[in-house]
Regions:
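Acidic, histidine-bearing metal-coordination/catalytic regions of metal-dependent phosphoesterases
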Residues: 2-168, 187-189, 327, 433-463
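Residues at the C-termini of beta-strands that transition into short coil/loop
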Residues: 10, 159, 170, 234, ...
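Divalent metal-coordination and catalytic microenvironments
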Residues: 72, 124, 171, 194, ...
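Extended active-site neighborhood of metal-dependent phosphoesterases/phosphodiesterases
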Residues: 125-154, 208-322, 348-362, 370-376, ...
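Conserved, compact domain cores that house catalytic/ligand-binding motifs in diverse enzymes
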Residues: 163-233, 238-239
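Active-site metal-binding loops of divalent metal-dependent hydrolases
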Residues: 169-173, 198-200, 236-237, 284-285, ...
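Conserved acidic residues
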Residues: 192, 325-327, 381
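Short acidic, glycine-rich surface-loop motifs adjacent to enzyme active sites
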Residues: 319-340
Length: 463
């Protein structure tokens, strides 16, 4: 990506632009200089800085019919914002500030802006900016300067009139070669949204590690999510490490007002209408029990899954979800596996039993028992999962009326390493594409090693 040109403005203009009520959209007024006696004014409002303030392209996160998130990395203490409008020149732009109510979210690494009050299935244009902050105490703070990315981006909100086209990626594990292949395929297919179905991470201990994965990865397409909205179903590795315990510092939650008070902690679950499809996102959480001593009692996956069950019940009853002809659910760990050697994730207390090949969950029987009956009652046709690093399709049966796709992993046709490395044609990354075509939901599974479509499946509208 070429180095961006940044627009420098004075501290006075930045302060005036940020003076509106926090997180409330406002029409941008003409800037007016303030009196020189303003105690917030810097003696040198345009102090030169050698380092760029904005360090990454924006990433579109957790989109919905009337809201979307924008995140980007910064190099110093900053107060960020997004200008949003329906006109390409942003002459109708409204300004959204980072943070929640009362105070802005000043941060020295990641700016997160939640944009609400949007119209469904509507294209918007946007530009990101940030004010460089000097903070010396509760009564001593000032804006030193401002940067705006010179590029204008765009996005389209979800909704019943939106394009019914999605792609799913999974188990990228910060491995840049397969991740680059995945993003090249996404760019080629140009879906309306992408579901990142878990294990983007490994074990991330610092926010800088998370920035490297989501906002500034070591790939060619640095702006991969600047105009393509992403939804996220976390995997078990996305909970591991000190930083990942609060992944929302980089991948934001929805605002509390976007969900019921009961569901405030469920900031990443989604129920989105996208054209004729309803997309449901669930979090299977860890692949080990809360009682496993390796986690020292510091995980609470059990209650988390139960809370999602109540959320799912209500989400499936929502009018825009209930009336969609196609219902597709997403979660990281599979909800079905007929291999008797595969651990179902409910072997107390420490996940170990000699009849199983692993001491972690290969699939999630507990989640299946809680969620599958609700999805079946709603007529769900397909659940797309991940975790096992090997593509598989489980056709529906009389006892299990939904199909399951297990996405591939990051291995490029080989298993093992060093002297133990050997060819394995069943190991390849996938992009699972879904679109409504000729009155059916068509699913295409793209094999990124062979460059071919591995499988195609079609689903009729639900009853």
């Amino acid at each position: 990506m070429k180095r961006r040109d940044f627009i420098k403005t004075s501290a006075l203009l930045a302060a005036a632009a940020g003076a509106g009520e926090l997180m409330k959209a406002e029409t941008m007024p003409a800037a007016k200089p303030e009196a020189a006696s303003d105690p917030m004014q810097s003696d040198e409002p345009n102090e030169p800085f050698e380092d760029r303030l904005i360090l990454s392209a924006p990433m579109l996160q957790n989109f919905a019919a009337t809201s979307i998130g924008v995140a980007f990395a910064v190099s110093a203490l900053a107060n960020g914002y997004v200008l949003v409008g329906e006109k390409p020149d942003l002459s109708d732009a409204r300004k959204f500030l980072c943070g929640g109510y009362r105070v802005t979210d000043i941060d020295d690494r990641v700016i997160r802006v939640r944009i609400t009050g949007l119209k469904p299935a509507t294209r918007y244009y946007y530009r990101i900016g940030a004010d460089r902050i000097r903070y010396d105490g509760g009564y001593r703070m000032k804006i030193l300067g401002n940067e705006e990315d010179s590029r204008t981006y765009h996005f389209t909100t979800a909704g019943a009139e939106a394009d019914a086209h999605f792609c799913v990626i999974n188990d990228t594990h910060a491995r840049w070669e397969p991740f680059g292949l995945v993003l090249d395929k996404i760019a080629e297919l140009a879906p309306a949204c992408v579901i990142w179905n878990g294990d983007a991470c490994n074990v991330e201990e610092t926010v800088e590690d998370q920035i490297r994965i989501f906002l500034n990865p070591d790939i060619r397409r640095k702006d991969y999510a600047s105009e393509m909205p992403y939804l996220f179903c976390p995997g078990n590795h996305d909970d591991r490490g000190m930083a990942n315990r609060h992944l929302e510092r980089v991948w934001m939650f929805r605002q509390p007002e976007e969900r019921l008070p009961r569901d405030w902690d469920l900031g990443r679950n989604f129920a989105v209408r996208q054209g004729d499809m309803a997309l449901i996102g669930l979090d299977t959480a860890e692949d080990k029990l809360d009682t496993n001593p390796i986690f020292a009692g510091l995980f609470t996956s059990g209650p988390y899954r139960e809370a999602q069950t109540e959320w799912l019940r209500d989400a499936l009853a929502r009018e825009e979800i209930r009336t969609a002809p196609y219902l597709v659910a997403f979660c990281h760990i599979p909800l079905f596996d007929d291999n008797p050697r595969h651990n179902p994730g409910d072997i107390a207390p420490a996940d170990k039993d000699p009849q199983y090949s692993t001491d972690f969950a290969y699939w999630q029987r507990t989640c299946a028992r809680m969620w599958a009956p609700l999805l079946e009652e709603a007529g769900c046709q397909l659940i797309i999962t991940a975790h096992q690093h090997r593509y598989r399709y489980d056709a529906p049966t009389a006892d299990r009326p939904w199909a399951q796709i297990v996405g591939g992993g990051p291995d490029l046709g080989f298993t093992g390493s060093g002297d133990n490395r050997k060819e394995d044609p069943g190991k390849f990354p996938t992009v699972v594409e879904g679109l409504v075509h000729r009155g059916h939901l068509e699913i295409r599974v793209h094999n990124l090693v062979s460059g071919t479509i591995q499988d195609r499946f079609t689903f009729r509208p639900r009853r």
